[in-house]
A protein has these predicted regions:
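Repeated loop/turn-to-beta-strand initiation elements of outer-membrane beta-barrel proteins
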Residues: 31, 61-66, 112-114, 162-170
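Extracellular loop and loop/strand-boundary signature of outer-membrane beta-barrel proteins
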Residues: 38-40, 85-93, 140-146, 177-182
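Residues that define the transmembrane beta-barrel architecture of outer-membrane proteins
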Residues: 29-31, 46-50, 94-100, 115, ...
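Sec-dependent signal peptide recognition
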Residues: 2-10
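Short glycine/proline- and aromatic-enriched beta-strand/turn motifs that initiate or cap beta-hairpins
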Residues: 19-58, 64, 123, 191-199
Length: 199
C-alpha cells in the first residue's frame, strides 16, 4: 500500500511539475531575442534574406517588438528616360533593402501548449542605397544611377512559435510588406529563426 501511495504521489507531483513548467513557457514580462533567415519574394523571384528582432511580452498575448531585416536583392520596375531614346522605357532591376520597423505580435496560447500561433502587424522604414545599375535597353547595355530612398512601409502576417523549453524556442513566419513612395510593389518574406527567452 505504501509503495502504491508513493508511486501515485510521485506521479501527481510529476504532473504538477510538468503543468507548471508548461504553463510558465508562455508568460508575461519576458523578452525574446532572436535571429532569422529566409527568403524574400519581390516582383520576379525569391532571394535570401536575414535579420534579428526583440520582443517584450507585455501580457501573455501582446508582444510589442522591433525588427531589423536585410534584403540583398528586391526586384523593382521603373519607367526611365534613356539618353538617345525619345520615349521612356520600363526597366527592371534588383536592389538591396534594409528594413527597420516596430509593431506587435498577437500571441494565441492554446491550453498552454508549447506550439503557439501568432499574428503580426508593424510599421517602419525601408531604405534603398544609392547605386549604379546595368540594364539592357533594346540590346544596348546602359548604366543608370539609382538615387537613395527611404520610405515608410506597413507589414502584416503571422507565424508559429515552438517553445523547446523555458529558455529556447524556434519560430516560422510569413509576412507581406506594402511600401509607400515611388515603389509601391508589395513584396513578402518567409523566415525561420530561433529565440532566447529572457526574464
Amino acid at each position: 500500500m505504501k509503495n502504491i501511495l508513493r508511486v501515485v504521489s510521485l506521479a501527481v507531483l510529476g504532473m504538477i511539475g510538468l503543468k507548471a513548467q508548461t504553463a510558465s513557457v508562455v508568460r508575461a514580462g519576458s523578452y525574446e531575442v532572436g535571429g532569422f533567415v529566409g527568403a524574400s519574394y519581390g516582383i520576379d523571384k525569391s532571394r535570401f534574406m536575414g535579420g534579428a528582432n526583440v520582443t517584450y511580452a507585455a501580457t501573455k498575448w501582446i508582444l510589442p517588438y522591433t525588427e531589423f531585416s536585410y534584403f540583398p536583392g528586391i526586384g523593382r520596375r521603373q519607367s526611365r528616360t534613356i539618353p538617345g531614346l525619345t520615349r521612356p522605357v520600363d526597366i527592371s532591376y534588383n536592389i538591396p533593402l534594409t528594413d527597420f520597423h516596430g509593431g506587435v505580435h498577437i500571441r494565441i496560447p492554446i491550453r498552454e501548449l508549447p506550439i503557439v500561433p501568432y499574428g503580426v502587424i508593424g510599421v517602419g522604414m525601408i531604405h534603398a542605397p544609392e547605386r549604379q545599375i546595368n540594364v539592357n535597353v533594346e540590346g544596348i547595355q546602359v548604366k543608370l544611377p539609382v538615387e537613395a530612398s527611404t520610405n515608410a512601409a506597413v507589414n502584416f502576417g503571422g507565424g508559429l512559435r515552438y517553445y523547446i523549453n523555458q529558455r529556447f524556442g524556434v519560430r516560422a513566419e510569413a509576412k507581406l510588406y506594402k511600401p509607400s513612395g515611388q515603389f509601391k510593389e508589395t513584396f513578402g518574406k518567409v523566415e525561420f529563426g530561433f529565440f532566447v527567452q529572457l526574464r
